[in-house]
Swiss-Prot record:
InterPro entries: C2_dom, C2_domain_sf, EF-hand-dom_pair, PI-PLC_fam, PLC-epsilon1_cat, PLC-epsilon1_RA2, PLC-like_Pdiesterase_TIM-brl, PLC_EF-hand-like
Residues forming the catalytic site: 925, 970
Gene source species: Caenorhabditis elegans
Biased composition (Basic and acidic residues): 1124-1144
Lineage of origin: Eukaryota, Metazoa, Ecdysozoa, Nematoda, Chromadorea
Name of the protein this chain belongs to: 1-phosphatidylinositol 4,5-bisphosphate phosphodiesterase epsilon-1
Gene encoding the protein: plc-1
GO BP, one annotated term: positive regulation of protein import into nucleus
Length: 1898
């Protein structure tokens, strides 16, 4: 027997009411008196009531104006009470109650539930009766009904029944009679749902609500216990315990013994034929199973909450994935009002949220909204929007309305949202459609706040706000429960920080703070997703969503297309009014006609081919599915296997399928052979071509009318089905699918890329027609409808680019075709027709080739197949592993293909193991300011927001407060002041949320000693273990200390302030004492600590006071006319500021800025007080004299010292960041400034060792013996001292931090660039803006970064381009706040170590990185505007030589998909400090930037990529992107002169972009591009050579233009000059000089290729108008054609009078192996030794001809030991002919012995021969003058080339094609004969023949 049997028993059998308590089954309101009396009679024991819950209820009565809090606290108590009772206790209670056991003596704990029911109901009655007036009773009733509603909403059905039973008391009958019927409607509805009259079973609404509560794993569901007792009473009373078996032959076999009689109520019929009633046992078991179902749900909830408390990072990956699969979505117990749109901005599931808290917030609670500025407060109802996109509140009141404005408040409050699931869901979320993006309207009585701009939610302490005083304004009673306050900080920009304050009782406040924090965190996570288009789609959908009365509707298709970018002028239609909702066809036809007419005008004159093309879309099931909510309801499954009927009832019915054939909407018509062919597939995989052959028509087919105009005839749009889908409001899934179709159809740029990929494929991949025709869309849809299942209502962020089950489940094929036609027509109305033909598909091989070649990512075929499965929408194509254009578009638009994705970058721990001085540190200037430097507010919230951006160094300007506590503000200005302690507390809370790397607090200290001590105490008490107050590492205790690495200082806070040191207690010995003794004394003095002296270690202040910069006139900088002497022996010191001169006026010091060389070369000081010393002092004496002098200076009285004294408490916590005044660069070999250059990873060990480390920055020159002895002795003494007393070397200069303002830093970098770079390797420098930035603007930090300065403090409150550059710098390291400096600044192994000078022009001479950039198009680049005229501005922000800016053309009136196709090549010398900025500008607003993006160049991924744009304030834009193509090339310089190779070098520029497709594989190496470095003389009078970079295809004109540009002659025209190639005289001086004028269009490298065997140069000469100049030019031209040479006086190029070969190192007496030639070669002073043979030390240049059809020759740099086989392989590598077998080719040497060819005609002859194949070469030379031979495979090419005495060259030939192949074959045959023996007379012949074989001359 099942529950149906029980239900039948309960319906057919009459229940005995005398045996069932009235509180379990009240019949009607008329019976309420007897029911209450009966219930009360059961709760009286010895005439004294039982009041177990009196204290709780009295406490709750004081907060009745917070009804939700009352409901929450009632639920908390009853939840514990209900689940503490086991199911069997209900049976025990019923059995005892039926035996008349008093309630007080009933052993079952169910009696506590019965007692609570009685007390709560009596309390509710008392609350209303005790009110003094009728109005007060009505107010109390409103609050009580809100309690019932809240209990129903959260699943506490037990408390709802308890309260309703109290309202049904007979004592309230007069009150109910006094109310109008509309005032009692809500009460009647509640009673009908929870207390149905004359029903044995609960109402259907109750059953549905219980089912929803059980489906939510985290709901605190509490069923009404009386239902279970009533079922047990019915079973026990109406069913007998024993069944008597009848006699054989009797008609009735069983006889129920239901009425025991007799005196003792025993049965009078007792026999052996009785059986236990199994039906009764089964029915009792069902009731117990129902109770167990709730208990099981409770245990699951507790377990789930415990798992949520564990951080996700601690959960294993496999378990996390399993939990994600098992996570259940959000379905509240009661449908939230306004949730009909079904939109959720965040995924509401059990994995992330406590869904019970979410539903409580969405139903709303009563809170107090407080406004601190005005002091006003109001009682408001605060709700979380169903989309979780905003919160809104409005004023309510639970007191008597005295204000006439509040007459409708009670009516608003009393409206109940208690309604059945299938009814209307009320109003949608109030998302304003016309409001500009912002925070929303914020008011005291009413307002809304978008959560996208919320920054944080936190509780407020009572000492910040007087919570009790605010609460008393709204309550006459005392605070019976704790009241909490929380604030919501919001603002769009970092400096926009506004607060909204709310107050509420304890549980409401807890739910709001925890729930809102989780919602905001999840929403911020959604906003951090790289592709934010789905978030944009949801917001647009909500803004278009409408409500008209009780009917809810979303946007229609044409309204959606307008939002996507379709012009309203194109549609010529407006949004229909409410009457359009009717089924009247007239309005639909008129709007459709307007849309068609507008599209017809746009399509007028277009070709038939484009209008008929249509791309198929994903297949969809034939059956139209139900809505998302009903789908969840129908698939959520039953609560339990043994649940009764009301828990097992199905919750939904399948929707009716669409009637009719999906193809019936198309009208067949005949096709002509001239109609356009259409390949590819329709929806579901059917070929549209074959479909047309059956007479079908594409949805976007057009016909040419007699007038030549095209009329749009979109099949199906004119039929009833087409109108249905055009007029039908869109759901969110349909809205997103329509956007996806629109976005695909408008991408003509992607179509071009797709066609290019197809055209470059070796074999076209076509889908066979017959095979396509086999697949019917109908069958495919049916299969999909069977296989696909969907049970989620949240559209993920990758919905637009990856395959999900949502689209196929919710969109039918008919809808898809209609939407596809609309999208294509709307795109065609915006511009040219879109070709959507699908005749070809991409195969995995083609996709792999595209990714490997263009995207520069190495993937295999399996990865390509996976990409197809992920992105291809067509199921048939996926089965065949083919990718259509739609899939290709999705693939390129996916975030894995974005150009730069900083959101996915994680810090690399291997890059965090170097000293702090090796990093750029994200730093803030005057962090507390929100705007102007001189006026405006200060905010402690700025510290939180700045730290959350990843900043790791914040500034605190500390001043004395009037109350004895320090304050933070900008001194002597008009800015406001904030508390010091408040700032420190915020820093502690926010320091390590974004990054766990160390935070530096830069203190600008202006406080007295007393308040400094308080500062130190606050630091210690608030920060606790986070504060670094001691030296921590082994290196700190050695004589060679170093700064710790960021990884060692995780979760630590460092204080940067001045450090206190001591004055020596006794005078120093005389300077004349020994150097060793002086050094020892000085070191000991620096290591002692004194308790009596509290003065600073520096004479001057740490930093120039910003106040003086703002109040005093800034000193004008003097223009330095002298050039920067990079390698000069002496450098002038920078000017000292006025403050430094004033404070150090009487101080005797020696400026160490005077020299950057060793102390051995230092001159005596020019200071007046410095005694003259001997110039021949040893290094020790000079060094220790300086140390002693500094100590004497510190010992002198400091009467003129204006520095602030330091409290010892504050000084003790200054460890690694000791602020000092910059007084110059230290000596290179100073003991107090050791340099640790062993750049291996820093040790993280905390153990201490006595081993002293040796400094590694000693000079490379050998030191004098005395110096060595002194150092050894000193090291031993220091080691002994270290062992004796382990004390950190606190005075080491590596711990000193210098602060410079912008102007001082500029002077320092300009005058001492090399010293600045060297100093910052071991020391930290902080720079900050100068006084001219009083408006809080920023200065460019790249120049400071380029010189190694680590902390460039910027004004974070100003979101300008500089801040965007700063953000991009630290985005490449995952926003951790630390970015490793370029290796050339600190790595000794780098080629530019000690050579990198950012301001020098020589930096451009090194090999650079070439960025070939094409800005193809943009998508939605102008937010909220579709028709602007835009252009793109491209800018490289970097060092001076890399900066460049250019603009593209203007695209008129199109900001939806403008196509620019702007290509440029950017040459970048310093890639690590180069940033690419792409800005979209509006030409109609004077070039105003509407969107931009700044990215690091080295992080840009090559290939076709999308780059998300940001606002001018650097905030992400949801839907704006730039589509670009990038290609990197690495310059490989080939130097033709020795001096160039000594000055410049080839650098390997490494890129840091990440490959998301194959993260475990390294990206494809950068292609190298050969650049030939030429020298051109003649541009200057002194014959100074100009360096010019040339490519293999550069013409003479291009080289001349570059030479004039480099010479500064930009105004000169190339036609005014000639470029002359002339030969240099031989050392003997006998040969004449040859000259030739090069034609402008001749490739320059053709001339260089013919330099083999000769020494030549290029000379630039300007043409003259005088006769002598014309004659000179004419004579040179004639000499080049007639064969005669013209002798001219040679121009001295070098000291030796000849051009050096391209060598970086000279050959010094290198012996050459000439055994292969059989003779000895004289190479030391040989006349004919080619200079190329001595180039580059061990390399030389060689030119090989006849490389390929498209490459006549190749110039290589090869090693001098390279063989012919090596050269051949190198030629093929350069020519990129990897599929050639190099063993089939040989190298042929051709030389000419004709002296005439070596004269004037030689160049022209060689140039003509260079471009011909080898079989055309020999006739050009006379046979008796030309010598050819094949080089052996192992023959040395350099030696062969060195033997040339005339013109020669190497030619690459196939071994089979050369004539020497025959000779080789004959040679092998003759060699065989010789081995066998030959006659003597023939030996001479064979030896002669042998001499002509390969390897020797012929």
């Amino acid at each position: 027997m099942n529950w149906d049997t029980l239900k039948g028993v309960l319906k057919t059998r009459r229940l005995t009411k005398r045996t069932i308590p009235a509180y379990i089954h009240p019949t009607s309101r008329s019976d309420s008196t007897s029911s209450t009396q009966s219930a009360t009679a059961g709760f009286i024991l010895n005439e004294e009531p039982i009041t177990l819950f009196r204290l709780e209820l009295e406490r709750l009565q004081y907060i009745l104006h917070f009804p939700e809090e009352v409901a929450f606290q009632l639920s908390s108590t009853e939840y514990q009470l209900f689940y503490s009772i086991q199911p069997m206790d209900y049976v025990r209670y019923v059995s005892c109650d039926l035996t008349s056991v008093p309630v007080s003596e009933n052993p079952s704990p169910v009696r506590n539930l019965v007692k609570r029911l009685s007390e709560v109901s009596s309390w509710i009655t008392h609350v209303i009766v005790s009110q003094p007036t009728h109005d007060d009773r009505k107010v109390a009733l409103t609050a009580i009904l809100r309690i019932v509603e809240t209990c129903w909403n959260i699943g506490n059905f037990n408390a709802a029944v308890e309260v309703l039973m109290g309202l049904k008391s007979e004592k309230l009958r007069p009150f109910w009679l006094s109310l109008r019927q509309e005032e009692k409607s809500q009460f009647d509805s509640l009673c009908e749902t929870l207390l149905p009259a004359n029903q044995a079973l609960p109402s259907q609404a109750y059953i549905n609500a219980v089912q929803r509560a059980l489906r939510m794993p985290q709901s605190r569901v509490i069923p009404f216990f009386g239902i279970f007792l009533r079922d047990l009473y019915a079973i026990v009373n109406d069913l007998p315990n024993i069944v008597v078996i009848g006699q054989e032959g009797e008609t009735q076999k069983l006889e129920f013994m239901s009425d025991p009689n007799g005196e003792d109520h025993f049965s009078s019929r007792i026999g052996v034929g009785g059986l236990l009633n199994a039906d009764k046992i089964n029915l009792v078991a069902i009731v117990l199973d129902n109770l167990e179902l709730f208990h099981r749900h409770s245990r699951t909830m507790i377990k789930l909450l415990e798992e949520q408390a564990v951080p996700p990072i601690q959960i294993p990956q496999n378990e996390r994935e399993q939990k994600e699969k098992e996570a259940k979505t959000y379905e509240p117990v009661q449908v939230v009002r306004g949730s009909s749109h079904g939109v959720a901005l965040i995924p509401l599931d059990t994995l992330t949220f406590d869904l019970d808290v979410i539903q409580r917030l969405q139903h709303g609670t009563t809170v107090i909204h407080y406004e601190p500025d005005s002091g006003r407060s109001n009682l408001c109802l605060l709700r979380l929007d169903p989309s979780c996109g905003q919160i809104n509140w409005h004023k309510i009141s639970y007191s008597v309305n005295k204000d006439p404005k509040e007459k409708d408040v009670l009516a608003k409050v009393s409206v109940s949202n208690l309604q059945p699931l299938d009814s209307g869901r009320g109003a949608p979320s109030p998302m304003p459609s016309g409001r500009t993006p912002g925070t929303g309207g914020v008011g005291v009585e009413e307002g809304e706040l978008k959560l996208s701009v919320v920054k944080g939610v936190e509780l407020v302490d009572s000492y910040d706000i007087d919570i009790e005083a605010i609460y008393r304004r709204h309550s006459m009673e005392e605070m019976s429960v704790p009241v909490s306050c929380w604030k919501v900080s919001h603002g769009q920009l970092l400096s926009d920080n506004e607060f909204i304050y709310f107050l509420a009782p304890q549980q409401i406040a807890q739910f709001w703070t925890n729930g809102l924090q989780s919602v905001v965190k999840s929403l911020q996570g959604q906003q951090r997703y790289p592709d934010r288009r789905m978030l944009w789609i949801k917001n647009v959908y909500l803004s278009l969503y409408e409500i008209t009365g009780e009917s809810n509707c979303g946007p229609r298709p044409f309204e959606a297309l307008q939002a996507f970018g379709l012009s309203q002028t194109n549609t010529n239609a407006t949004r229909p009014n409410d009457s359009s909702l009717s089924s009247e066809p007239g309005g639909a036809k008129s709007r459709l006609k307007n849309l068609k007419n507008a599209m017809q005008k746009k399509l007028r004159g277009a070709s038939r081919e484009g209008s008929r093309s249509q791309s198929p879309q994903p297949h969809s099931p034939l059956v139209r599915p139900p809505s998302i909510k009903s789908q969840i309801s129908s698939q959520s499954g039953p609560p339990g296997p043994n649940s009764p009927g009301y828990l097992l009832k199905p919750r939904g019915e399948p929707a009716n399928s669409d009637a009719g054939d999906i193809d019936s909407i198309y009208t067949p018509r005949s096709r002509t052979p001239t109609s356009s062919s259409y390949g590819g597939r329709s929806v579901g995989g059917r070929s549209c071509k074959s479909w047309r052959s059956r007479g079908g028509e594409t949805p976007n087919s057009g016909s040419i009318s007699s007038s030549g105009q095209m009329s749009i005839q979109v099949s199906g749009l004119s039929g009833p089905s087409g109108k249905e889908f055009q007029e039908k409001p869109l759901t969110l899934v349909e809205f997103a699918e329509l956007f996806r179709l629109f976005n695909t159809r408008m991408r003509k740029d992607l179509r071009d890329v797709f066609n290019d990929v197809l055209s470059t494929a070796t074999t076209p991949q076509h889908c066979p027609k017959r095979e396509r025709d086999r697949h019917s869309p109908r069958m495919q849809s049916r299969l999909a409808s069977v296989s696909n299942s969907y049970n989620a209502d949240f559209l993920s962020n990758d919905f637009l680019t990856r395959n999900t089950a949502v689209t196929s489940h919710h969109i039918s094929e008919k809808q898809n075709k209609i939407y596809n036609a609309l999208a294509l027509a709307s795109v065609n109305s915006m511009g040219g027709l879109m070709d959507t033909s699908r005749s070809s598909m991409l195969t995995p091989q083609m996709l792999r080739a595209f990714v490997n070649t263009h995207q520069m990512e190495q993937i295999d075929e399996q990865t390509a197949i996976k990409l197809i499965q992920d992105h291809e929408p067509d199921g048939i194509c996926r089965q065949k592993n083919q990718m259509s254009f739609e899939g290709f578009t999705r693939f390129l638009c996916d975030p894995v293909n974005f150009a730069f994705v900083p959101e996915t970058i994680e810090p690399d721990e291997e890059d965090l193991r170097y000293p702090l001085s090796h990093y750029y540190i994200n730093s803030s200037h005057n962090t507390y300011l929100t705007g102007h430097q001189l006026k405006g507010p200060s905010s402690s919230e700025m510290y939180r927001q700045v730290l959350l951006t990843g900043c790791r160094c914040v500034e605190l300007d500390c001043w004395d407060g009037d109350d004895g506590l320090p304050l933070i503000y900008h001194g002597h200005t008009l800015v406001s002041k904030i508390g010091f302690r408040q700032v420190v507390e915020i820093i502690k809370k926010s320091a390590f949320i974004t990054s766990d790397l160390p935070v530096i607090l830069s203190i600008e200290n202006h406080c007295s000693l007393q308040q400094q001590a308080k500062m130190a105490q606050m630091f210690k008490t608030v920060l606790g273990d986070l504060l670094v107050s001691n030296f921590l590492f082994e290196a700190d205790f050695s004589d060679s200390p170093r700064l710790p690495c960021p990884l060692q200082m995780k979760n630590k806070i460092l204080i940067k302030n001045k450090k206190m040191i001591v004055d020596p207690p006794t005078p120093l010995p005389m300077i004349e004492r020994g150097a060793v003794q002086r050094g020892e004394t000085q070191l000991n003095l620096h290591r002692k600590q004194s308790k009596n002296s509290y003065e600073s270690s520096t004479v001057d202040e740490v930093e120039d006071d910003d106040l003086d910069e703002f109040l005093d006139d800034e000193e004008n900088e003097e223009d330095d006319q002298e050039e920067v002497q990079v390698r000069s022996e002496k450098e002038d010191s920078p000017k000292t500021s006025k403050r430094a001169e004033k404070s150090a006026r009487n101080i005797k010091q020696q400026d160490s800025l005077c020299s950057d060389h060793s102390v051995e070369q230092a001159k005596p000081s020019t200071s007046k007080t410095t005694s003259k010393t001997n110039d021949r002092k040893t290094e020790d004496e000079v060094l220790y004299a300086q140390l002693a002098q500094n100590a004497i200076r510190n010992q002198q009285p400091r009467k003129n010292n204006t520095g602030v004294q330091i409290a010892p408490e504050l000084s003790d916590i200054v460890i690694y960041m000791q602020a000092t005044k910059f007084k110059g660069f230290p000596p290179v070999d100073g003991i107090q400034s050791p340099r640790i250059m062993e750049e291996g990873p820093a040790s993280a060990s905390l153990s201490f060792s006595s081993r002293a480390r040796t400094p590694s920055n000693l000079l490379n020159t050998p030191a004098p013996p005395r110096r060595q002895r002194s150092s050894t002795q000193l090291s031993q003494e220091l080691a002994a001292e270290f062992l004796g007393s382990v004390r950190a070397n606190a005075t080491a200069t590596c711990y000193q931090v210098t602060s410079l303002n912008e102007n001082a830093a500029k002077k320092l970098m300009k005058r001492h660039p090399a010293k600045c770079v060297s100093y910052t390797r071991d020391h930290l420098i902080r720079t900050y803006p100068s006084a001219k930035h009083y408006d809080s603007s920023n200065f460019n930090p790249i120049n400071c970064w380029a010189h190694g300065m680590q902390m460039v403090a910027l004004n974070f409150q100003t979101p300008d381009v500089i801040m965007a550059v700063n953000q991009a710098m630290f985005e490449q390291s995952g926003n951790c706040g630390y970015q490793l400096k370029p290796r050339c600044l600190w790595d000794e192994s780098h080629l530019l170590y000690n050579k990198f000078l950012p301001l020098s022009k020589d930096i451009a001479g090194h090999s650079a990185l070439l960025l070939n950039l094409t800005i193809i198009s943009g998508q939605h680049v102008y937010p909220n505007t579709h028709y602007a005229s835009l252009y793109v501005e491209i800018e490289v922000i970097g060092i001076h030589n890399d900066c460049v800016r250019e603009k593209s053309k203007v695209v008129q009136r199109n900001s939806v998909n403008p196509i620019w196709n702007h290509t440029t090549q950017l040459r970048i010398a310093c890639v690590d400090l180069a940033f690419l900025r792409i800005a979209v500008c509006d030409s109609g607003q004077n070039g105003r930037v509407v969107a931009h993006r700044v990215v690091p160049v080295k992080c840009i991924r090559p290939g076709f990529r999308h780059l998300p744009l940001r606002t001018p304030t650097n905030l992400p834009i949801d839907n704006a992107m730039i589509f670009l193509r990038t290609r990197f090339e690495q310059e490989e310089h080939i130097y033709l002169h020795d001096d160039d190779s000594n000055t410049y070098c080839n650098l390997e520029h490494t890129l840091a972009y990440r490959t998301d497709l194959t993260p475990n594989l390294s990206p494809t190496p950068i292609l190298k591009k050969q650049i030939f470095v030429l020298r051109i003389t003649g541009a200057f009078a002194d014959e100074t050579a100009i360096t010019v970079h040339s490519e293999s295809g550069s013409t003479v004109k291009t080289v001349m233009q570059q030479a004039l540009l480099n010479a500064g002659k930009n105004a000169d025209q190339v036609e005014e000059y000639v470029l002359i190639e002339e030969s240099l005289p031989a050392p003997s001086g006998e040969d004449p000089i040859e000259q030739r004028v090069l034609p402008l269009n001749e490739p320059i490298m053709d001339a260089v290729a013919c330099w083999n065997g000769s020494m030549r140069r290029f000379v630039l000469r300007k043409k003259g108008s005088d006769p002598s100049s014309r004659a000179w030019i004419t004579s040179i031209i004639k000499s080049g054609t007639s064969g005669s040479s013209t002798s001219v006086s040679p121009s001295p190029l070098t000291k030796d009078g000849h051009v050096k070969s391209a060598s970086s190192n000279q050959l010094h007496g290198r012996s050459l192996d000439t055994d292969a030639f059989g003779e000895h070669l004289e190479v030391t002073e040989g006349k004919w030794l080619n200079p190329r043979a001595r180039s580059m030390g061990d390399t030389f240049l060689v030119c090989v001809h006849n490389v390929s059809e498209d490459q006549p020759y190749a110039i290589l740099r090869a090693g001098i030991h390279s063989t012919a086989a090596d050269i051949i392989r190198q030629v093929f590598v350069k020519a990129r002919r990897s599929n050639v077998d190099d063993s089939e080719f040989v190298l042929v040497e051709e030389t000419c012995d004709d002296p005439k060819l070596n004269q004037g005609q030689s160049m022209l002859q060689a140039l003509s021969l260079a471009r011909k194949r080898s079989n055309d070469l020999t006739p050009k030379y006379p046979n008796n003058r030309t010598t050819s031979r094949v080089l052996g495979q192992n023959e040395n090419v350099w030696k062969a080339q060195s033997r040339w005495k005339s013109m020669g060259r190497f030619v690459l030939e196939n071994r089979k094609d050369t004539v020497h192949a025959t000779l080789e074959k004959e040679f092998h045959e003759m060699a065989k004969i010789i081995r066998e023996g030959i006659p003597k007379k023939d030996e001479t012949y064979y030896m002669i023949y042998y001499s002509g074989l390969p390897g020797e001359d012929i």
